[in-house]
């Protein structure tokens, strides 16, 4: 549901920010 959507968006956001801060 909505909670799961928010959770996956949070995971995606963290990965995205992580790539900006610490690119591979």
UniProtKB/Swiss-Prot annotation:
Tissues where this protein is expressed: Expressed by the skin glands.
Source superkingdom: Eukaryota
GO-annotated cellular components: extracellular region
Main location: secreted
Entry keyword Secreted: yes
Ion transport is among the record's keywords: no
Swiss-Prot/TrEMBL keywords: Antibiotic, Antimicrobial, Secreted
Entry's localization field: Secreted
Example GO BP: defense response to bacterium
Function text: Has antibacterial activity.
Family to which this protein belongs: Belongs to the gastrin/cholecystokinin family. Magainin subfamily.
Official protein name in the record: Xenoposin-precursor fragment B1
Organism of this sequence: Xenopus borealis (Kenyan clawed frog)
